[in-house]
Amino acid sequence: MLKTVLVSFINLICALSYADQTTQNPNLTSVASNVDVASNQSDDLLPAEAAVHFVQPWARPTINVQGKVSNSAMYFTLINTRNKSYQLVNISSDKIGGIEIHQTINDQGVNKMVKVDYPFLISGNINVDFKPGSRHIMLYDPKVDLNAGDEFQITFFFDDNTQKIVNVKVANDNPYNKIGN
C-alpha cells in the first residue's frame, strides 16, 4: 500500500515537473514541432493513438551469455499534444517477454528502480523524458538478441481501446544525440 502511494506521488511530481520542461536536444525540438497532428479536431474526439507520441525511441542492446539473453531498457520522449489526458494500460512486443514502466528513485542515498503500475496517466499537453537513470521502460526476457543497429516494434495500448505501434532503434547510447554532429 505504502509503495503504491509512494509511486503514485512520484508519478504526479514527475509529471508536474516535466510538464513545463523543454528538451535540451535541438533535434527533438524540430521533431516535436512536427508532431502536432489533426489540430482541427476536438480534444475530446481525438484518440490517444493520434495525440500521444513516443519520440526518438531507442533501447540498449542485450548481452547473450550461454544462451541467456539479458534484460534491456527503452527510452524516448513522451508527448501528448492535446489538453485531454489519456491512460496507458499495457505495453507489449512479440520480441519481448515482459515489459514494465519503471521510475528510478533515491532512497536514503541509494538509487532504486520502482515498478509503475498501470494505468499510467498521460496528462494533457505534457512532454516527459524517459531516460537513463530516471523513468524508463524495462524489457524483460527478450525472445531474441537485441543488437546495436537492430530495430523492433513495441505496441502501446490506451484506455480508449486504441494502440500505437512504435519502431525502436537498438543502440549503445542515444542514437538521436548524434544527429547533425
Swiss-Prot record:
InterPro entries: PCuAC (IPR007410), PCuAC_sf (IPR036182). It comes from the Bacteria. Disulfide bonds: none annotated. Signal peptide: none annotated. Pfam families: PCuAC. This is Uncharacterized protein RP573.
